[in-house]
């Protein structure tokens, strides 16, 4: 229960070898009273809801969902690309309001995704699934990630590694798939939006704070970029007066890209497999490396979602 007090959590988990928080966290002031706890198993790809480094100092490992929601998030990502390009929200509003196509023909020409250059920032489980889904659209896919793929994997996945600034300058669509930590918070800001084409669109289905929302709003208002498709925002739920909800060039969904029945089932199955590994004292899967976070947390380096 996310509303449980620290005392209630300690009582509930005092004999647990593993915990699977849902819509809640395991605070350090609770974890330090749980000497048997070995694993905090997350059902999400992101791990910003827990203090990985602090838990590791207590001998507790943190594992994410092992890419269980990668297909769900990648499908939602591509749907946002298409929706922004084809002005779906405006078309729906016109149709629903009985205007049909009246006024729609005066909108900027809708755009095909076919043949466009798509830049993927963060080429982990989700980024790679996005690349696979774009292959059917004959897109040129480029990516940036600090973790190099094994030789030959670029061609296998139909993507080419480039530096970040080049990706921003040449991409028609920029989509970001990184974990939220101190190195990625605000990594898409005014400088980055100004590097993008004024015809380019920005997609974010990972974590809201990786983009600077005020800078994104200004970029859209001033036609620095052409559009945005967002499943995440800096504050959730957002203020109903948030300009991003009222711009014809932006589409916002309520942080549910990964929330499909299939994705949820895979996440639960993966979590159960790791719980079995704890019970059998076997090697755990998809454990977040605290040493890497500690080493790289003050750089722009730890981008790959395991």
Identify what each model region corresponds to.
Residues 28-30, 142, 146-243:
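Rossmann-like adenosine-cofactor binding region
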Residues 62-63, 199-306:
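Rossmann-like dinucleotide-binding domain for NAD(H)/NADP(H)
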Residues 1-18, 138, 279, 295-306:
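N-terminal glycine-/charge-rich "phosphate-binding" loop or analogous flexible N-terminal tail
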Residues 1-63, 189:
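An N-terminal-biased, well-structured beta-alpha scaffold segment characteristic
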Residues 43-44, 60-71, 164-165, 206, ...:
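Short beta->alpha connector loops at strand-helix junctions that form conserved
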Residues 58, 65-117, 129-132, 151, ...:
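Phosphate-binding beta-alpha-beta segment of Rossmann-like dinucleotide-binding domains, i.e.
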């Amino acid at each position: 229960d996310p509303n449980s007090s620290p005392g209630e959590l300690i009582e509930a988990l005092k004999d647990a070898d593993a915990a699977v928080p849902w819509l809640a966290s395991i605070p350090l002031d609770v974890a330090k009273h749980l000497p048997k706890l070995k694993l905090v198993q997350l059902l999400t790809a992101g791990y910003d809801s827990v203090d990985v480094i602090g838990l590791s100092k207590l001998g507790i490992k943190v594992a994410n969902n092992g890419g269980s929601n990668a297909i769900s998030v990648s499908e939602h990502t591509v749907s946002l690309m298409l929706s922004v390009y084809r002005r779906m929200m405006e078309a729906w509003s016109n149709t629903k309001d009985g205007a049909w196509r009246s006024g729609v023909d005066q909108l900027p020409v809708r755009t095909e995704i076919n043949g466009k250059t798509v830049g993927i920032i963060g080429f982990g489980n989700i980024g790679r699934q996005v690349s696979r889904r774009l292959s059917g659209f004959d897109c040129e896919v480029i990516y940036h990630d600090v973790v190099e793929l094994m030789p030959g994997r670029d061609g296998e996945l139909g993507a080419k590694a480039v530096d970040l600034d080049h990706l921003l300058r040449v991409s028609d669509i920029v989509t970001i798939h990184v974990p939220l930590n101190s190195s990625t918070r605000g990594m898409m800001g005014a400088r980055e939006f100004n590097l993008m084409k004024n015809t380019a669109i920005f997609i974010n289905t990972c974590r809201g704070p990786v983009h600077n929302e005020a800078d994104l709003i200004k970029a859209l208002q001033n036609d620095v970029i052409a559009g945005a498709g967002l499943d995440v925002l800096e504050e959730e739920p957002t203020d109903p007066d948030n300009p991003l909800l009222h711009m014809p060039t932006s589409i916002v969904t309520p942080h549910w890209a990964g929330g499909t029945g299939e994705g949820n089932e895979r996440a639960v199955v993966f979590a159960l497999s790791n719980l079995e590994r704890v019970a059998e004292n076997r090697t755990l899967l998809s454990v977040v490396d605290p040493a890497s976070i500690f080493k790289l947390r003050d750089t722009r380096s730890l981008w790959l979602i395991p």
